[in-house]
Design a protein with these regions (language model features):
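Conserved A-loop
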Residues: 382-386
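Hydrophobic/aromatic residues in alpha-helical transmembrane segments
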Residues: 49-56, 90, 94, 109, ...
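Hydrophobic alpha-helical interface/terminus motif in multipass membrane transporters
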Residues: 53-57, 113, 213, 217, ...
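Cytosolic ends of transmembrane helices, especially the final helix of ABC transmembrane type-1 domains
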Residues: 299, 318-357
Length: 387
């Protein structure tokens, strides 16, 4: 793949990902259904435990009624057991249909090969395109494989955001008592809007930094696949008994040693990827993590200040902190996933370039119309008869 073909707009990237997801659904609908079911279930269930735990803590800090505490604890334990049971079933369903996913993807590509006109199949450009798709798939999973991972993450983060927001809205609408004096300013809509704006800005900034780090791997896709080819050949050359004589006569083990033991290899300590990790990629990822900690600090301070003034009880603190940090991680994950989808789009474009190769030759059967004004002549060549 040419490195100058890396720039794809977000709109086109989303269209390519959506088309790829529909392609999966056409071939493997139960795989998609099992994936979505487990994703939604895993996104919703944490909030059930958060809510029930908050009720237990609130009761322990309040009336301390033994009957109510016993009831809440029983409900929490039964809910946890039920969630675990259903999760195990959904995971088994998904694992069953996800087994051999690499072969499932290759089936989609191979069906196109079998359906292709021979002149296109025999074209070296077609086979180079197919080989490039397979290499990117076998390496970092670029192309169709990452589509499933990205949509799973996007679906999970989306439902998690919806549930989290429904539990955190009251955090910003709850009023601080007027006896709190200076902290009453937190009731001001302008102050609340400013705090939300800062949280949104931090939430957006963190995954954007992580996305910039991910772009370095896209730029290195050609080197990645080339290094995999070198390793696949020279790393196993010594085990090929058919080439053992050539290895000894021409001392080819020195060539293998050069490629297998060199620390300048892209995957080794002095290679390109190591330099990325020590340089720009490491910087962007560290900055992304630092920004996420800033958000956590702001969330804790805001929630604890409102609880300190008596806006809500200790149980609500647990609920709000858990929910708001969950919303933050989900929004960050959603933005990060969209960045990954845009990075993956260039490889999907390559895949669909292969799948969209037209079949110009006629496929099927042609009938010959028999007419009285036409004379047909049938000639047999190299025909034998057996009685």
């Amino acid at each position: 793949m040419k490195t100058n073909e890396k720039n794809i707009s977000l709109k086109e990237a989303l269209q390519l990902n959506h088309r790829a997801y529909k392609l999966f659904y056409r071939y493997y609908p139960k795989l998609i259904l099992s994936q979505i079911s487990l994703t939604i279930w895993k996104a919703l269930t944490p909030y059930i435990i958060i809510y029930l735990s908050a009720l237990v803590i609130e009761e322990l800090a309040g009336d301390r009624s033994p009957d109510r505490i016993r009831f809440l604890v029983t409900i929490t334990l039964l809910s946890g057991a039920g969630i675990s049971l259903i999760s195990a079933f959904l995971k088994k369903w998904k694992r069953t249909w996800s087994a051999g996913l690499g072969m499932k993807i290759k089936r989609i590509l191979c069906e196109k090969l079998f359906d292709m006109d021979y002149c296109d199949l025999d074209d070296s450009k077609t086979m180079e395109l197919y080989s490039s798709i397979i290499q990117n798939l076998n390496g970092p999973g670029w192309g169709l494989y990452n589509v499933l991972l990205n949509y799973e993450a996007l679906c999970s983060e989306g439902f998690s955001i919806i549930c989290g927001l429904s539990m955190t809205i009251s955090l910003f609408t709850s009023q601080i008592p007027k006896t709190a004096e200076k902290l009453v300013i937190l009731n001001n809509p302008v102050c609340v809007t400013a705090i939300i704006s800062v949280m949104v800005l931090i939430t957006w900034f963190s995954p954007v930094l992580a996305g910039k780090a991910g772009k370095y791997w896209v730029r290195s896709a050609d080197l990645h696949t080339f290094s995999n080819r070198l390793f696949a050949y020279y790393g196993r050359l010594g085990y090929d008994s058919k080439k053992a004589a050539d290895m000894r006569i021409y001392q080819q083990e020195k060539i293998c040693e050069k490629h297998n033991l060199s620390k300048e290899n892209p995957f080794c300590s002095k290679g390109l990827f190591a330099r990325y990790g020590k340089g720009p990629v490491g910087f962007y990822m560290a900055a992304s993590s630092a920004v996420s900690v800033i958000f956590t600090g702001i969330a804790y301070v805001f929630v604890c200040l409102k609880a300190w003034t008596g806006a809500f009880g200790i149980g609500a603190v647990t609920k709000y902190i858990s929910s708001i940090t969950k919303v933050y991680s989900s929004v960050s994950g959603c933005i990060s996933t969209i960045e990954d989808m845009q990075n993956n789009a260039v490889f999907l474009k390559q895949t669909f370039e292969f799948l969209d190769i037209p079949n110009n030759m006629y496929q099927g059967s042609l009938t010959t119309e028999k007419r009285s004004d036409r004379k047909y002549e049938i000639e047999f060549r190299n025909v034998s008869f057996r009685y």
